[in-house]
Structure formats: structure tokens, C-alpha cells
């Protein structure tokens, strides 16, 4: 067993890179990828691609993600969360009714400017490093999609509201929280952020790590998720010996399937062989996998 998924739950207070480093040390010499960085102050689902599964990680990066986050109204911080320095204050706190009603304004495709404290690169340097050094960071606005946004709870005494968001890749929840507050004629920052789902990987099925000292290779491998799991809803064709050989060597391979398909996968003897597209019966591989039964 050397290629699979691990649905790990990242706790608050550790970076995504540090968590990957710990898992890699436990598993030994194996390639590991993940579906998108979670802030140090955030927690939640961080699916890890092990071995050949790294060839599919872009699918998870592109997948919908869901978050639950709490906004504290009345202040703005330089980082957009509780770890930053307060840079602005207002006495105006939005009403419960408005905190709920504002959600509909954000559903759909919207423009968002990533926060200065982000992992995006500016001239080869991470934006957050420039921001920490007090340098001005200019990031270009980008289009993102909010599929669903709703207020789950409003705490008048503490001036907070908790929201659920289902969104596209590239969405920054800290920026969404700030924009929500601004639309409510107030200021706000994130005090709690939890990613609850990435594609098929859900919070309730994630691996909780109480102590990193207790992790073993066996305990992780026992909770592996098959590499094909994220392909379950996608067309699959079974290859015979001749077709499999051609695909492995990058040769033209024909299938008895009349429809053109933009994205599909090929299985050989029950195992993932390749992903790609089908045009006029001809399979064009995007990625070929080196897996055994």
C-alpha cells in the first residue's frame, strides 16, 4: 500500500506544511500533497494525497469547499483574524436581522481581493512575509463563487455572528468576513474558522490526531481511502491487455464508446490506470498511474 488518501483534521495552532512534514516523517519516503493550505489559526479537513494520489490533487484543489466561521464585529485587524493587530474600530454593530439578511447579497460569482497575509506570491515572495515586514502588498482581485452562505447564529452580547459558506477554490474566508462586515456598515474579523468539507472528504470522517507522538504508520494506513474514491461519479472504461499497454506507452488507444468525454478514467484489472478525455473513440491520457493490484 503506497498510494491512497488520508482525510486528516488539522488542529488549530499548527501550519499545514508542518502537519504534512509530521505525516511524511511517520510514513517514510513517500510523496505527499494536499488540497490547499489552511491558516495556522484555522482548523479542519486537510485531505492528504499519498504516492500516486498526488497526480489527482488538482481535482481537490478545484473542488467545492465548505467552512463554518465566526465574525467579531466592531474591529478590523491587519491579518483579518484574531492573531492580527487592530487597525480600525467602529461603534456600529449590525443587527441580528441584517446579519442574516446580508447573506443573499454574496451568493454567486463575486470579486474578492486576497488578504495581504496570504500564501500567494508577489515577485517570488510569499505575501504574508512582505506584510509581516511592514511592506505594502498589492494583490489583484479575482473572481470566486459562493454557492451557499447562511448565518447560523448571532450573539448580540458578544457582537459575533457565525456563518456557513460553500465556495469555490481561491476563496479567502477572512476576506469574505471583512466584506460581510463592511456591507453591514461595520468592521469585522474572524475569530474562529473551520473547514468542514473538501470535495468528498468530510469533517465527520476525518482522522483526529490528539497527540502527534502517538501517530504510527499502521494507524494511518488503517484509515486509508482508496485512490479512486474521488472518481466515483466520473465515467470509467475498462481496458483490456492491449489497450492498457498502449496507454502505458502513450500510444493511440481506441475504445468502443461513441460519445466524446471531457474527463474520464480508465481502469485495468480493477485498478486505476489513467485519467484523460475521449474524442472520437480515441483516449487521450492526462495522467497515467503506476499502481498494482
Curated annotation (Swiss-Prot):
<dbReference type="GO" id="GO:0031119">
    <property type="term" value="P:tRNA pseudouridine synthesis"/>
</dbReference>
<dbReference type="GO" id="GO:1990481">
    <property type="term" value="P:mRNA pseudouridine synthesis"/>
</dbReference>
<protein>
    <recommendedName>
        <fullName>tRNA pseudouridine synthase B</fullName>
        <ecNumber>5.4.99.25</ecNumber>
    </recommendedName>
</protein>
<dbReference type="Pfam" id="PF01509">
    <property type="entry name" value="TruB_N"/>
</dbReference>
<feature type="active site" description="Nucleophile">
    <location>
        <position position="39"/>
    </location>
</feature>
<keyword id="KW-0413">Isomerase</keyword>
<dbReference type="InterPro" id="IPR014780">
    <property type="entry name" value="tRNA_psdUridine_synth_TruB"/>
</dbReference>
<keyword id="KW-0819">tRNA processing</keyword>
<dbReference type="InterPro" id="IPR032819">
    <property type="entry name" value="TruB_C"/>
</dbReference>
<comment type="similarity">
    <text>Belongs to the pseudouridine synthase TruB family. Type 1 subfamily.</text>
</comment>
<dbReference type="GO" id="GO:0003723">
    <property type="term" value="F:RNA binding"/>
</dbReference>
<dbReference type="InterPro" id="IPR002501">
    <property type="entry name" value="PsdUridine_synth_N"/>
</dbReference>
<dbReference type="InterPro" id="IPR020103">
    <property type="entry name" value="PsdUridine_synth_cat_dom_sf"/>
</dbReference>
<comment type="function">
    <text>Responsible for synthesis of pseudouridine from uracil-55 in the psi GC loop of transfer RNAs.</text>
</comment>
<dbReference type="GO" id="GO:0160148">
    <property type="term" value="F:tRNA pseudouridine(55) synthase activity"/>
</dbReference>
<dbReference type="Pfam" id="PF16198">
    <property type="entry name" value="TruB_C_2"/>
</dbReference>
Amino acid at each position: 500500500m503506497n498510494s491512497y488518501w488520508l482525510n486528516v483534521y488539522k488542529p488549530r495552532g499548527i501550519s499545514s506544511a508542518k502537519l504534512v512534514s509530521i505525516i511524511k516523517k511517520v510514513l517514510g519516503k513517500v510523496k505527499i500533497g494536499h488540497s490547499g493550505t489552511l491558516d495556522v489559526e484555522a482548523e479542519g479537513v486537510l485531505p492528504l494525497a499519498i504516492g500516486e494520489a498526488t497526480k489527482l490533487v488538482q481535482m481537490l484543489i478545484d473542488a467545492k469547499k465548505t467552512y463554518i466561521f465566526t465574525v467579531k464585529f466592531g474591529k478590523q485587524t491587519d491579518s483579518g483574524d484574531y492573531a492580527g493587530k487592530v487597525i480600525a474600530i467602529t461603534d456600529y454593530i449590525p443587527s441580528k436581522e441584517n446579519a442574516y439578511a446580508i447573506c443573499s447579497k454574496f451568493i454567486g460569482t463575486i470579486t474578492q481581493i486576497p488578504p495581504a497575509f496570504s500564501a500567494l506570491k508577489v515577485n517570488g515572495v510569499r505575501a504574508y512575509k512582505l506584510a509581516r515586514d511592514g511592506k505594502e502588498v498589492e494583490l489583484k482581485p479575482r473572481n470566486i463563487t459562493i454557492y451557499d452562505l447562511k448565518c447560523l447564529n448571532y450573539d448580540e452580547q458578544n457582537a459575533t455572528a457565525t456563518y456557513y459558506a460553500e465556495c469555490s477554490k481561491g476563496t479567502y474566508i477572512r476576506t469574505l468576513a471583512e466584506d460581510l462586515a463592511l456591507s453591514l456598515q461595520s468592521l469585522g474579523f474572524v475569530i474562529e474558522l473551520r473547514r468542514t468539507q473538501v470535495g468528498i472528504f468530510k469533517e465527520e470522517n476525518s482522522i483526529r490526531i490528539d497527540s502527534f507522538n502517538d501517530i504510527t504508520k499502521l494507524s494511518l494506513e488503517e484509515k486509508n481511502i482508496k485512490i479512486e474514491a474521488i472518481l466515483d461519479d466520473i465515467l470509467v472504461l475498462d481496458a483490456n491487455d492491449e489497450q492498457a499497454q498502449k496507454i502505458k506507452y502513450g500510444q493511440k488507444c481506441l475504445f468502443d464508446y461513441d460519445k466524446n468525454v471531457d474527463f474520464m478514467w480508465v481502469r485495468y484489472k480493477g485498478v486505476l490506470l489513467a485519467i484523460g478525455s475521449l474524442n472520437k473513440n480515441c483516449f487521450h491520457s492526462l495522467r497515467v498511474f503506476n499502481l498494482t493490484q
